[in-house]
A protein has these predicted regions:
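Acidic, metal/cofactor-coordinating or nucleic-acid-engaging core segments within structured domains
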Residues: 158, 162, 187, 249-312
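Short, hydrophobic/amphipathic alpha-helical packing segments
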Residues: 168-180
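A domain-level signal for the structural core that forms small-molecule/cofactor-binding pockets
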Residues: 9, 19, 23, 125, ...
C-alpha cells in the first residue's frame, strides 16, 4: 500500500490513473514486470479503512492510498553477496539481521559507474582499548548508514560481480517504448528495480513472467529476478508529436541513471548503449504499427535528441 504524502506535484490519485493506464493497455512485451494494481482507497471510505487500520501501525490514519502487488526482494544470498562484496568493512550478518534491510530491491544503474574504495582498513592487532572502542562506534554508525532497501548497483559493480547487464538494457528499452508509444506517457521519474519474479501460479496478470534478463549467469549471482517498474506519480501524458518527444527526452535525463548513456569512452558502455538504442527503435516500431509515417519517425527523433544532448554536455 502506498499512502498519499501531500508532497507538492505528487498526487496518489494521479499515480493511480497513470498506473492503470500503463497496465491495462495490451502490450506484447514481456521483458519487464509492473506491479498489478489492486485498487484505490479513498480517505472517506470508512468501511474499507475500518478493516485495514487495525493491521497497520497505531499512528496510521485513513488517507488516499493505492494498493498494488508487492515486489518480492532478492534472495538472502544476493543480499549477503552485495554486503560482502561492496562493504567488506562491516559484518554482513549484522546487516542481514537488520529488519530495515530485509526488503532488498536493487536499482540497476546502467548509466553510471562508481569506483568505491572502502575507507576502513583492517584493524591492527595491536589496537588499544580506546582504538577498539572508536572502531566499534564507527562500525555502529556505518551499520545505521547502510541500507539495502534500494541498493544502487552501478556498471562497474555489475562487472565486478560478473553480471551481464544487456538484458536489463533490453527490459528498460521495452519499458520506455511501451510508456511512450502504447500508454503515451513520458516515464518521468519512474523507478527500475530488480526483485524476484511474481509467482508462476499467478494468472491474474496479463503479462507472462519476464525471462529475457534471467540468464543462467545472472540468476546464479543474484538468484531468480526480473526488472520491475514502479512509481508513476510524476509521469505525464505526451502527445504523439515533436513536443511530446521533447517532453520524453527531458524525462529521460531527469531520471536516475538507470538507462545506458551514449558517448562513453568505455567500450562496454558503448555496447550497452547500442543494445538499448536498437531495442528501443525495434520495440517502438512494433508498438506504432498502423500509425502514420510522421508518428513512426518519433522514436528515432527521441534517440537523436538524447545523442545530441550527450554530445553538447561532453563538449
Amino acid at each position: 500500500m502506498k499512502r498519499e504524502d501531500g508532497s507538492t506535484g505528487r498526487s496518489i490519485s494521479h499515480e493511480y490513473r497513470m498506473h492503470q493506464k500503463i497496465t491495462t493497455i495490451p502490450s506484447p512485451f514481456t521483458s519487464f514486470a509492473i506491479p498489478q494494481s489492486a485498487g484505490f482507497l479513498d480517505a472517506e471510505d470508512d468501511a474499507a479503512w475500518s478493516a485495514i487500520l487495525p493491521r497497520l501501525p497505531p499512528d496510521y490514519t485513513a488517507c488516499n492510498a493505492i494498493v498494488s502487488e508487492k515486489i518480492l526482494p532478492v534472495k538472502d544470498s544476493a543480499r549477503r553477496l552485495l554486503v560482502q562484496t561492496f562493504r567488506p568493512d562491516v559484518d554482513a550478518e549484522d546487516i542481514m539481521r537488520s529488519q530495515s534491510n530485509k526488503h532488498c530491491l536493487v536499482r540497476p544503474y546502467l548509466g553510471r559507474r562508481r569506483f568505491y574504495q572502502s575507507e576502513m582498513g583492517a584493524a591492527s592487532t595491536g589496537e588499544s582499548e580506546r582504538q577498539q572502542q572508536q572502531q566499534r562506534q564507527r562500525r555502529r554508525r556505518l551499520l545505521r548508514a547502510i541500507s539495502l532497501r534500494n541498493f544502487p548497483l552501478h556498471m562497474d559493480q555489475m562487472e565486478q560481480l560478473g553480471i551481464d547487464p544487456s538484458g536489463y538494457a533490453v527490459a528498460m528499452a521495452d519499458a520506455l517504448a511501451v510508456m511512450h508509444w502504447v500508454a503515451h506517457v513520458d516515464g518521468n521519474d519512474v523507478e527500475f528495480v530488480l526483485g524476484q519474479p511474481r509467482c508462476q501460479s499467478d494468472t491474474s496478470s496479463s503479462s507472462t513472467i519476464p525471462r529475457d534478463i534471467c540468464s543462467d549467469t545472472n540468476t546464479a549471482i543474484l538468484g531468480p529476478h526480473v526488472v520491475w517498474i514502479l512509481d508513476f506519480d510524476l509521469c505525464r501524458d505526451i502527445s504523439l508529436d515533436e513536443e511530446g518527444v521533447g517532453q520524453a527526452h527531458h524525462a529521460f535525463w531527469g531520471n536516475d541513471p538507470y538507462f545506458p548513456r551514449p558517448g562513453s569512452s568505455n567500450l562496454a558502455d558503448q555496447r550497452l548503449w547500442a543494445i538499448f538504442q536498437d531495442r528501443y527503435i525495434k520495440s517502438s516500431a512494433a508498438a506504432l504499427q498502423g500509425e502514420p509515417d510522421r508518428v513512426k519517425q518519433l522514436p528515432g527523433l527521441f534517440i537523436e535528441l538524447i545523442k545530441q544532448a550527450r554530445s553538447v554536455s561532453s563538449s
